UniProtKB/Swiss-Prot annotation:
This is Protein ZINC INDUCED FACILITATOR 1. It holds the Pfam family MFS_1. Keywords: Membrane, Transmembrane, Transmembrane helix, Transport, Vacuole. Belongs to the major facilitator superfamily. Overexpression of ZIF1 confers increased zinc tolerance and causes interveinal leaf chlorosis. PROSITE patterns: MFS. GO terms for molecular function: transmembrane transporter activity.
Length: 486
């Protein structure tokens, strides 16, 4: 009886022989049980793309100092911001292009291209000998870093409907952990000849290039992921007509017959129409806008936290070494992983993605207000309060972003997910381009107003971060943020 049911189900779905997307759909229909293998693949690929994004922040302060471009100590944050934003500028310029390519040629080729580019350009960044080489290699790394948008589409296609929240949670968890573990690696492995002289001599490669070891480590991991990606299935369908509803079949068939004629030029027109329909899809566009605002906060916070922790106490910082910053971020990564695996799916099921985003954003505000006061502590109390605040901020930030990823993928069909996520990546990258540059300039400015009457020093920095969060939370209310009925 069960076999007859399966056959009837497969026949009803009208799968196509030789279509990789149909093979995945068949697998989803017939498979029972938790998708551990697929979840592992998604998790490790997204982790590989997020590791290099923030890995430079713990040592960027010292890297800029070594380049000798900053005239004074207070100018270091200014130059650090431009190195940080070059990655996002590159990604902003290419995200839509990679999304369209993924919709046309498949997810798997784009995933392979992305992991290979990480291995190459991140290693070259570690070998940077001057300010402009650092900016150039980070720009190229961002230009070819096309994985996040593609992986969001891929994750929504490889899992059954009941695991969609888990899929998006896996994407955002791996992304968030990569943004934490990456800086932790940067903190522990930068300047190895100074920290571990028994292992690395000053005359060795890592003694001459003080920041190459964390970059090479991440590149080696990306190479390993590239090999694993050869075994993942393609999810894009290579047929179009049979999956459409009978109500639309006549119109689409007529359009297809016109497209087959070279004289009509309908194909390009239809593609432009599809692109325009995405821009008019308000559930998609509203969720992308909120997503961009919260991502702006996320990237600005990441850079400011590292600069603030590294900066001297006389400027309101913590005077932390790269190792100490790495320890805080590693602990935050553990807390984030535990929360996203065990708590977030339950929270999303209970509250829904909109409320999760709203509540998470609101809770970040009082925690960020406490950071300048935490800097006044010392010893065990400083470590305890700083680690608790860092864990909470990272957990809440990733939870808010996860809810928006779910809303974005619910707002479009499969044929548009690559392009939709490309639009989201472009918009987000533009905001994240502003984030590091703005954060560096803001931080440098705050160190010049330590005795100001209104929000002196780091108080101003964290106040601006809270303003961004308040805007993001306000946009989660109707009529601005609407959800799709798909």
């Amino acid at each position: 009886m069960a076999e007859e049911y399966k056959e009837a189900l497969l026949e009803k779905q009208n799968y196509h022989d030789g279509c990789p997307g149909c093979k995945v759909e068949q697998m989803k229909q017939l498979r029972r049980g938790y998708p551990y293998l697929e979840l592992s693949f998604v998790w490790i690929i997204v982790l590989s793309t997020s590791l290099p994004i923030s890995s430079l922040y713990p040592f960027l302060y010292y890297m800029i100092e070594d380049f000798g471009v900053a005239k004074t100590e207070k100018d270091i944050g200014f130059y650090a911001g431009f190195v940080g934003c070059s990655f996002m500028l590159g990604r902003a310029l290419t995200s839509v292009f990679w999304g369209i390519v993924a919709d046309r040629y498949g997810r798997k080729p784009i995933i392979l291209l992305g992991t290979i580019s990480i291995a190459i350009f991140n290693a070259l960044f570690g070998l940077s000998s001057n300010f402009w080489m650092a900016i150039g290699t980070r720009f190229l790394l961002g230009s070819f870093n096309c994985l996040l948008g593609t992986m969001k589409a891929y994750a929504s296609e490889i899992f059954r409907d009941e695991y969609q929240a888990t899929a998006m949670s896996a994407v955002s968890t791996a992304w968030g952990i990569g943004l934490i573990i990456g800086p932790a690696l940067g903190g522990f492995l930068a300047q190895p000849a100074d920290k571990y002289p028994n292992v690395f001599s000053q005359e060795s490669l890592f003694g001459r290039f003080r920041y190459a070891l964390p970059c090479f480590t991440i590149s080696a991991f990306a190479l390993l992921v590239t090999v694993l990606c050869c075994f993942i299935p393609e999810t894009l369908h290579n047929h179009k007509l049979d999956s459409l509803s009978h109500d639309d079949s006549y119109d689409i068939l007529e359009a297809a017959s016109h497209e087959s004629s070279p004289s009509t030029g309908k194909a390009g027109k239809n593609e432009r129409k599809a692109s325009q329909s995405l821009l008019k899809n308000w559930p998609l566009m509203s969720s992308i806008i909120v997503y961009c605002v919260l991502c702006l906060h996320d990237t600005a916070y990441s850079e400011i936290f590292a600069l603030w922790a590294n900066s001297p106490r006389k400027y309101g910082g913590l005077s932390y070494s790269t190792n100490e910053v790495g320890t805080v971020l590693a602990i935050s990564g553990l807390g984030l992983f535990s929360f996203q695996v065990f708590v977030y799916p339950l929270a999303e099921k209970l509250l829904g993605p909109v409320l999760v985003t709203r509540y998470a954003g609101a809770l970040m505000i009082p925690i960020q207000m406490s950071y300048p006061f935490i800097a006044g502590l010392s010893g065990l109390s400083l470590s305890l309060m700083l680690n608790c605040a860092s864990i909470l901020i990272n957990v809440l930030s990733v939870s808010a972003i996860t809810g928006l990823l779910i809303l974005q993928n619910r707002a479009v069909d499969q044929s548009q997910r690559g392009a939709a996520n490309g639009i989201a990546m472009t918009a987000m990258s533009l905001f994240k381009t502003v984030g590091p540059a703005g954060a560096g300039i803001l931080f440098s400015w705050s160190e010049r107003r330590l005795n100001a009457a209104f929000l002196p020093g780091s108080h101003m920095v964290f106040f601006v971060l809270n303003v961004i969060v308040v805007v993001g939370v306000a946009l989660t209310f109707k009529p601005f943020l609407t959800t799709s009925r798909r």
